[in-house]
């Protein structure tokens, strides 16, 4: 094949490395404005890093030629080292095998069995917030949403409430995220005997013990529930007939657990942040949520709550939790007439693509009335694209469409004075440090 020698424009290594010390999503956005859809960033002694901002180029890497761009970049290897070799982080044949195992557990029909659990926990939060509203107590939304989605995920996974174990569950995840998000070029191995690494090791052992205890406990009553752990315990390899090993289950659960609650919890917190900045949308959201009968959740809610869905879509557009998707070029390629070297690191950025002025009018504006129908899967992909598209997308959307109407049926809110919300862009995009709101019952 003929290859072009045309080289994409981009910053020098010094400017690039300095930019990584600040707000990286906004830095990538500034690089897009300055250098265009394909940005080349040199790294001494290594193949270059490319930032892709155009939806077509991102689709090329994640979907059309996905086999040429495996998850073998250094960020993905860090994720695997921290969270195990489950379907979220595995590569190659191991990933294909585990993804095939886990896919049925996240299909719509299977998830319907969990609706009553999600409904119960959403209503429990409403009752808790009613008490706080009556007492005029502030609510810290970031931690509240993280705790709610953690509770939901663990009940869906294990039929088990983690409320008394939240710190033990969250602490190793927090330390792992800090390690994964260490900026280039600080290539610090997790196995180096640093105080942080030792702390992660011991905290991670605690989490593994919690998971192993749940697996051992549930082995005694296989088939008694319809949750994900029961699904994994009942699984038999279609060729060998062998069940999953405990280690394989542990690896899967270690990756699904943090990915499942951190992302959805952050999306809910971003929704409150955006509505707090644009309070003119709260009344319309309240009105729509109260117009629908307070019945058990079903997929029909997606059609009966269009403005609510628009608020969620806009939140995921502006603050996609998977804001950068990393791959490695296994072979030389060409993108937009630019040569892509073998071994190059490819960063596909939904954060910048969702703000691309060629596809989005007033891209920085929060507009729940946007028409997303023509953008789905092409210029809008908060859950990724291609074969590695987020396996938990259906569960995340069900949680969002259950929690948001439940809360805004009962409450309006205002944001209280506090520190300015910033973006924590390590691994997923989360608001930090906190967001305090004052609730008012309707």
Walk through the language-model features, giving the residues of each.
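Cytochrome P450 heme-thiolate monooxygenase catalytic core
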Residues: 1-7, 71-76, 94, 110-266, ...
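N-terminal membrane-proximal hinge/A-helix region immediately C-terminal to the signal-anchor transmembrane segment
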Residues: 1-97, 116-128, 148, 160-163, ...
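Conserved cytochrome P450 K-helix E-x-x-R motif and the immediately C-terminal K′/meander segment
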Residues: 18-36, 209, 213, 296-336, ...
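Cytochrome P450 heme-thiolate "Cys pocket" and heme-binding signature region
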Residues: 97, 254, 259, 296-300, ...
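Cytochrome P450 fold signature focused on the C-terminal beta-domain
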Residues: 222-226, 286-305, 318-338, 353, ...
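Cytochrome P450 catalytic-core helices
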Residues: 261-282, 286-288, 393-411
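Hydrophobic, well-ordered secondary-structure elements that form the walls
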Residues: 285, 315, 340-343, 366, ...
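Conserved cytochrome P450 K-helix/beta-meander segment immediately N-terminal to the heme-binding cysteine loop
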Residues: 348-374
């Amino acid at each position: 094949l003929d290859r072009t020698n045309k080289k994409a424009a981009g910053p020098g290594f010094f400017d690039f490395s300095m930019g990584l010390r600040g707000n990286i999503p906004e830095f990538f956005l500034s690089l897009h404005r300055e250098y265009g859809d394909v940005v080349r960033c040199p790294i001494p002694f290594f193949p270059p890093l490319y930032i892709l901002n155009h939806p077509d180029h991102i689709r090329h890497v994640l979907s059309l030629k996905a086999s040429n761009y495996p998850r073998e970049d250094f960020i993905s290897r860090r994720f695997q080292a921290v969270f195990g070799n489950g379907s979220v982080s595995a590569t190659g044949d191991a990933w294909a095998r585990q993804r095939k195992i886990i896919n049925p557990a996240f299909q719509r029909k299977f998830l319907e069995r969990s609706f009553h659990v999600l409904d119960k926990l959403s209503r429990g939060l409403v009752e808790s917030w009613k008490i706080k509203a009556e007492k005029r107590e502030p609510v810290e939304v970031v931690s509240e949403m993280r705790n709610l989605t953690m509770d939901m995920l663990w009940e869906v996974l294990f039929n088990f409430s983690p409320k008394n174990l939240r710190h033990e569950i969250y602490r190793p995840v927090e330390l792992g995220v800090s390690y994964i998000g260490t900026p280039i070029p600080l290539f610090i191995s997790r196995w180096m005997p640093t105080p942080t690494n030792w702390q992660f090791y011991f905290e991670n052992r605690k989490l593994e013990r919690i998971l192993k205890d749940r697996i051992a406990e549930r082995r005694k009553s296989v088939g008694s529930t319809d949750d994900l752990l029961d699904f994994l315990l009942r699984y038999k390899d279609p060729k060998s007939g062998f069940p999953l090993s405990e280690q394989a289950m542990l690896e899967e659960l270690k990756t699904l657990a943090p990915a499942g609650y951190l992302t959805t919890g952050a999306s809910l917190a971003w929704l409150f942040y955006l509505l707090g900045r644009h309070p003119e949308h709260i009344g319309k959201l309240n009105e729509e949520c109260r117009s629908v009968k307070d019945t058990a959740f079903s997929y029909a809610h997606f059609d009966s709550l269009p403005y609510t869905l628009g608020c969620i879509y806009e939140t995921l557009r502006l603050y996609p939790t998977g804001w950068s998707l990393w791959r490695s070029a296994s072979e030389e390629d060409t993108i937009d007439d630019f040569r892509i070297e073998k071994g190059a690191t490819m960063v596909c950025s939904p954060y910048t693509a969702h703000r691309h002025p060629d596809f989005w009018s007033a891209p920085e504006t929060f507009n729940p009335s946007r028409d997303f129908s023509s953008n789905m899967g092409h210029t809008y992909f908060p859950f990724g694209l291609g074969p590695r598209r987020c396996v938990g997308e259906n569960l995340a959307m069900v949680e969002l469409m259950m929690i948001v109407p439940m809360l805004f049926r009962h409450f309006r809110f205002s944001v209280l004075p506090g520190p300015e919300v910033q973006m924590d862009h390590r691994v997923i995009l989360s608001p930090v440090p906190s967001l305090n709101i004052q609730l008012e019952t309707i």
